[in-house]
Amino acid sequence: MSVTLDLQIACADSTGLPSETQFQQWLDTAVLPFQQEAEVTIRLVDEAESNELNLTYRGKDKPTNVLSFPFECPPEVEDFPLLGDLIICRQVVEKEALEQQKTLESHWAHMVIHGSLHLLGYDHIEDEEAEEMEALEKEFMQTLGFPDPYKDDEI
């Protein structure tokens, strides 16, 4: 029962980033309730790479906090543990944490959990799906000792 993490740091400045142990803990919290064996790549990038990927895959010409690329296993291959890749933009995460008055650690954890749920097939396009996904995010954040990441989104 384990999640294998391939952490890639592609940021020009890697100081102040969460540790590999932190990323592993956040990933385990989000993935293990659903999948006993998994492999996930988390790539930490700067704005230029995030912008390029966001434009290429989503048609949006701006960097974004997290992009999720689920692995699509061919039907003839069974029980392949590769879950997918998360691309997280350091500058966007740092800017959002400041704007939303969240601790940087809390926001990093939330981005890993949010992205991991996308890899597992969760989405937030429809209201009902969004509620289910947000409930899981809140539960996992609480498990890790972090506050509700959506508490200030309610009006």
From Swiss-Prot:
Regions crossing the membrane: none
Top-level taxon in the UniProt lineage: Bacteria
Cofactor notes: Binds 1 zinc ion.
Subcellular location(s) of the protein: Cytoplasm
Single Gene Ontology MF annotation: RNA endonuclease activity
Keyword terms, alphabetized: Cytoplasm, Endonuclease, Hydrolase, Metal-binding, Nuclease, Ribosome biogenesis, rRNA processing, Zinc
Top-level class of the enzyme under EC nomenclature: hydrolase
Residues involved in Zn(2+) binding: 114, 118, 124
Cofactor: Zn(2+)
S-adenosyl-L-methionine listed as a keyword: no
InterPro entries with a match to the protein in the record: MetalPrtase_cat_dom_sf_prd, YbeY, YbeY_CS
A Gene Ontology cellular-component term: cytoplasm
Entry's EC annotation: 3.1.-.-
GO annotation terms (biological process): rRNA processing
Similarity section: Belongs to the endoribonuclease YbeY family.
Protein role: Single strand-specific metallo-endoribonuclease involved in late-stage 70S ribosome quality control and in maturation of the 3' terminus of the 16S rRNA.
Protein name (record): Endoribonuclease YbeY
Native species: Tolumonas auensis (strain DSM 9187 / NBRC 110442 / TA 4)
